[in-house]
Amino acid sequence: MTSPYPRPVGRVVVTGGSSGLGAAVVDAVRAAGGSPAVIDRVPFDDGGATPFAQADVSNHIEVEHAIAAIAAELDGIDAVVTAAGIDRCGTLGEVDAVEWERVIGVNLLGTVSTVRAALPYLEEVHGRAVIVASSLALRGVSDATAYCASKFGVLGFSRALAAETRGRLGVTTLIPAGMRTGFFDDRPEQYKPGADAQLIEAAEAARAIVFALQQPQGVEVRELVICPEEEPSWP
């Protein structure tokens, strides 16, 4: 039996909410009548309108404390969106081992830690987890072994989580193509998108996330691919 549609968005914790896709999700959740909260290493300041906890998602203890603090402030959590992510470009031999493992720590282990910490709150309300993967969770490319490995892992984790928590938690994997955000700003020029690159707007992906959050209990959007109409690399 399903509940009415659209389901209220509710109290949504967004990792990486200070910039990029995460910031767009914060705006979209608020526009849909929800109550966003942010976990990020980078300070988030909108005059106190949005609950914020500073944490490095690769540190599970910091994540646990951040989730607990936000849950206490909001009197619970209805959903999490794992938008925090980083990349280190270069061949396997070129990327320092510590930096390579850092990508896994943030993208994969940070996702796991966030969901694990939020799970007790989410299961109380049959909440939702929207887990952000990437089109590079479906195909491998050169000079991106860390990022591809992390996102392949995120996709596998999300699918297994959906099976493990069926009937208790809604799980959606978002699979976005490249987005027009600051994600590429610190890359060497050879790894930045070209002037003719087909990128989606973060706000478009954020609206898709809200769509998943609004699905009634009993209806699941398991995987959602967001890409340009003429996506050249799909799949």
Pin down the residues of each PLM region:
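The beta1-alpha1 cofactor-binding region of Rossmann-like NAD(H)/NADP(H)-dependent oxidoreductases
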Residues: 55-65, 97
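Residue(s) in the substrate-gating loop at a strand-loop-helix junction
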Residues: 134
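C-terminal helical subdomain
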Residues: 173-174, 193-234
